[in-house]
Every structure is written in structure tokens, then in C-alpha cells.
């Protein structure tokens, strides 16, 4: 098993030696079963001829020129197995124990590198991501600038079109106002002339009515005077007739009254004589009875 593993490890893969690994006395008999169980797992021995498709899915290979980055990708990992094995054998380990430690160390390092590769971001990935982010940001900025320029140009064209429309509308409004002003002036003049003609006609009619009224008043006044004189003449005739009647009736009435008075006087005298005779007869009768 160890010989096969050793043959599988080529010298070309071990160009870079792992520094800073302290070798302690390890019970190899405890580590050998663990190393044998790890041999069943997938090994990540990276070499110059390793294809990227053989690596685990989800891992991105970034070939960078930086030698002192903290985490290298699995494809750039090189383990100097010969120097490591020679160092262990110089420390007193046998060849099998050294090969077991080599295998276990290789497994631990590979697992740690895979864990770091899955959980941490390498400097190259970070640089690529930052570069992609800066590129996307610059593209977004340029697109935003272009969009803003397009918007500004569209706004300017819309503003110019609006200005032209406003100017045309202003010109149309001025034309309509001038037309309305002219029409209103003409209408006002026509109305003024019509009103003047109507006033003249009304004045002529008023004068005509005044003349007719004056003539009618003259006729009415003459008729009134005529009727007044007729009434005066009628009243004078009535007064004269009444006066003549009085002149004729008063003497006749006075004569009738004088005659009535004379008759009354005679009747009075006759009555007083009869009363005296009755009084004398009464006194005679009374005396006879007594």
C-alpha cells in the first residue's frame, strides 16, 4: 500500500516544500488505520497536468501570479514528499512509519486546503470579484451616464418642441385676439351707427308726436273755449229765463198772498164774533140754571 502510494507521488509534484510544519513524535500505529480510512476518500493531488474538470464541482480555479497569498487553490498545491519523508527518517522513524505520517499529513493538509477553499475567499478570487464589481460598476455608471444623456437629450428635444408649440400657440392667440379686436371694433361701429339712426328716428318721431300733440291741444283748447262759451250762453239764457219767471211770478204771488191774508183776516174776525156770541149764550144758560 505505502509503496503504491509512494510510486503514485511523483517528484515533479513536490517542487514546493511546506514550511512551518513541526514534526512531533506520533504513534504511527494509531494514525495508520486513520490513514487507511482516508485512502478511500477522493484525493486532491494537484499537478501541472491536472485538469480543472477533475476538481470538485463548485470550485473556481484562478491562476494568479502572486506567490505569497494566504490560501492557494487545490490546483496550485505542491507537497515535497521526498524531503518530508527524509526528514522523518532522519528523526528516527522507520520507512513505513514515515510513509504513514506522510500519508496522514497529506490527507490533513488536503482536507484543510479543501475546507479553506470552500469557506474562504482567496485573494485572486477577491481580486477577480472586485475587478468584476468595478467593471460592472463602471458599466453601470457609463450606462447611467448614457441613459442620463439620452434623457437630457429627450428632455431638450421635448423642451424645444414644447417651446415651438408655445410659440405657435402664442402666435395663434395673437392672431385670434387681433381678429376679435377688429371684429369687435366693427361690431361696435355698426352698433353705434344703428343706435344713432334709432336715436334720430326716435327724435323725429318725438317731434312729430309733439307737433300732433300741439295741434290736438290747440283743437282741444278751441273746443273747450267753444263749449265754455256755449255753457256761458246757456247759463245766461237760463238765468235770464229764471229772472223773467221771477219777475212774472213774484207780483202774482204777492197778490195771491195778500188775498189769502185778507181772507184769513176776515175769517179771524168772523170767528172772534162767533166766539163772543157763544160766550154770551153760555153765561145766560149758566145763570138760568143757577
UniProtKB/Swiss-Prot annotation:
Q: Which GO terms describe its biological process?
A: regulation of proline metabolic process
The record's listing under Pfam families reads: CCDC90-like
- The answer, when asked if Flavoprotein is one of the entry's keywords, is no
A single cellular component GO annotation: mitochondrion
Q: Tell me where it mainly resides.
A: mitochondrion
Q: How does it sit in the membrane?
A: Single-pass membrane protein
User: Which key words tag this protein in UniProt?
Assistant: Coiled coil, Membrane, Mitochondrion, Transmembrane, Transmembrane helix
Give the matching Gene3D superfamilies: 1.20.5.340
Concerning InterPro entries, the annotation shows: CCDC90-like
Q: Where in the cell is it found?
A: Mitochondrion membrane
Iron-sulfur as a keyword of this entry, yes or no, is: no
Q: Which residues cross the membrane?
A: 236-256
Coiled coil segments of this chain: 161-216
> What is this protein's record name?
Uncharacterized protein C27B12.07
Organism (species): Schizosaccharomyces pombe (strain 972 / ATCC 24843) (Fission yeast)
Amino acid at each position: 500500500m505505502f509503496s503504491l502510494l509512494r510510486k503514485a507521488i511523483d517528484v515533479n509534484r513536490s517542487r514546493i516544500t511546506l514550511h512551518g510544519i513541526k514534526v512531533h513524535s506520533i504513534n504511527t500505529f494509531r494514525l495508520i488505520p486513520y490513514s487507511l480510512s482516508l485512502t478511500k476518500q477522493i484525493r486532491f493531488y494537484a499537478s501541472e497536468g491536472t485538469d480543472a474538470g477533475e476538481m470538485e464541482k463548485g470550485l473556481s480555479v484562478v491562476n494568479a501570479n502572486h506567490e505569497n497569498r494566504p490560501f492557494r487553490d487545490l490546483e496550485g498545491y505542491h507537497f515535497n514528499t521526498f524531503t518530508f519523508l527524509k526528514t522523518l527518517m532522519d528523526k528516527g522513524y522507520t520507512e513505513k512509519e514515515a510513509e504513514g505520517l506522510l500519508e496522514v499529513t497529506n490527507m490533513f493538509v488536503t482536507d484543510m486546503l479543501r475546507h479553506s477553499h470552500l469557506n474562504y475567499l482567496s485573494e485572486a478570487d477577491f481580486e477577480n470579484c472586485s475587478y468584476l464589481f468595478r467593471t460592472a460598476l463602471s458599466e453601470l455608471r457609463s450606462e447611467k451616464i448614457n441613459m442620463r444623456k439620452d434623457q437630457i437629450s429627450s428632455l431638450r428635444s421635448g423642451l424645444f418642441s414644447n417651446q415651438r408649440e408655445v410659440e405657435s400657440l402664442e402666435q395663434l392667440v395673437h392672431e385670434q385676439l387681433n381678429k376679435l379686436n377688429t371684429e369687435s371694433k366693427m361690431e361696435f361701429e355698426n352698433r353705434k351707427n344703428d343706435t344713432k339712426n334709432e336715436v334720430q328716428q326716435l327724435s323725429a318721431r318725438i317731434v312729430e308726436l309733439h307737433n300732433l300733440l300741439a295741434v290736438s291741444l290747440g283743437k282741444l283748447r278751441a273746443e273747450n273755449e267753444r263749449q265754455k262759451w256755449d255753457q256761458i250762453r246757456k247759463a245766461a239764457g237760463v238765468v235770464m229765463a229764471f229772472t223773467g219767471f221771477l219777475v212774472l211770478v213774484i207780483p202774482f204771488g204777492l197778490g195771491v198772498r195778500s188775498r189769502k191774508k185778507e181772507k184769513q183776516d176776515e175769517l179771524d174776525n168772523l170767528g172772534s164774533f162767533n166766539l163772543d156770541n157763544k160766550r154770551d149764550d153760555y153765561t145766560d144758560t149758566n145763570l138760568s140754571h143757577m
